[in-house]
From Swiss-Prot:
Cofactor note: Binds 2 [4Fe-4S] clusters. One cluster is coordinated with 3 cysteines and an exchangeable S-adenosyl-L-methionine.
Cofactor: [4Fe-4S] cluster
GO molecular function: 4 iron, 4 sulfur cluster binding; metal ion binding; methylthiotransferase activity
A cellular-component GO term for this protein: cytoplasm
Domain MTTase N-terminal: 19-135
Disulfide bonds: none
Listed name of the protein: tRNA-2-methylthio-N(6)-dimethylallyladenosine synthase
Binding site for [4Fe-4S] cluster 2: 170, 174, 177
Boundaries of every TRAM domain copy: 396-464
PROSITE patterns: MTTASE_N (PS51449), MTTASE_RADICAL (PS01278), RADICAL_SAM (PS51918), TRAM (PS50926)
Record CDD domains: Radical_SAM
Amino acid sequence: MLTKTIQEEKKTPKDESIGSYWITTFGCQMNKADSERMAGTLEKMGYSRAIDELKADLVLYNTCTIRDSAQQKVYSFLGRQIKRKHSLPKLKLVVAGCLAQQEGESLLRRVPELDLIMGPQHVNNLENLLERVDSGNQVVATEETFISEDITNARRDSTICGWVNIIYGCNERCSYCVVPSVRGKEQSRYPKAIKSEIQTLAQNNYKEITLLGQNIDAYGRDLPVTTKEGRKENTLTDLLYFIHDVDGIRRIRFSTSHPKYFSKRLIKACYELDKVCEHFHIPFQSGNDEILRLMARGYTIDKYKKIIENIRSLMPNASITADAIVAFPGETEKQYQDTLRLISDVGFDQVMTAAYSPRPNTPAAIWNNQIAEEVKKERLKEINELVEATSRKRNQRYLNNTESVLIEGLNPKNSMQMMGRTRTNRLTFVEIPENIEFNYSFGDELNVKITEARSFSLSGQIYK
């Protein structure tokens, strides 16, 4: 018999829905977490979630601008809603996120049908902004502001795993990256507020949390408290120790890390704290020191390799994932080959790859040594083939092993399989036993014997 535990939906405080909403999210985990908070705000206001984007009374696009392709996708989606707006003037159109912050007033000139344009720093102010819209105003909220503490329960997409923002913005100035200009300066949340949110998640039967930040291991640099030794008291390492005792939470993850701040002390904490999962996402971006210098990344390949060595010395089976950019302006064939060599030498579990895309208001965008599009395509194809082969090889180490898998739901493509993730963040499909009574709840951790290993997922059977 299969039983399924689903968290009860919170009821809207309004007696009746004031309309339906639809949110489409583009981009990173930070955007997804922001969307969950905005959905919570809308439901607190009395909106209900629509079953169809083209029937919603309020449509919100939470946007990304890290690459041009993500930006163009937003304009394509907007085109469908603009046609609706002409026949349904009461339809509210909202563009939030990084594209909204980047374009600001110019986006309103390009798409005058928009009701609200709001940058990431204004996510927690959505209700007030919509009240201004209801008063007949078109609103552009992109001014830099202090991010108010979120007091609204997020409308979370998962009932098992929850995202928790701990630091907003980024103070780094990588020459290719638009994030600092669209998400603002670093603003760290105070540890007690973070722990309180995690405790609420635990009370609602969440089993795993992922701490989020654009530059997460820089957490606490802007907080005032220091130790007697002069060290910042509120670092990511300190936070991990502080939240580790929350009852009910079984797994803790964090992302995204910057190599410049990934310390031995942090690695030691991850080893000592048994709830912290053995999965580390540490972008390297390029395997060549000169390209890293031009990118203004602030570390060398030797330093990066030393970080991986330190992790694996304590946690030999840890999963290491990363980001890489190919065809950065001026990248020679030899420099590109250095990136391929690094992937082979380190043996990453997965690498998220992209060809360089010039972004507005970044130094690299105006350099005159841009790489031809054809070369970009060739390099991206080659690196993706290497990543797939490397990932497949790395995953073979799981074969015939028994892994702890946190069950998150059913496989949407096969109702006779559950799916979840190992502590090392490997997506795993688990066969539901036949001909025996088997009780489970989503959120259970099951021992699974791995029977098949592919490039980006595993399959297995319950092991008793």
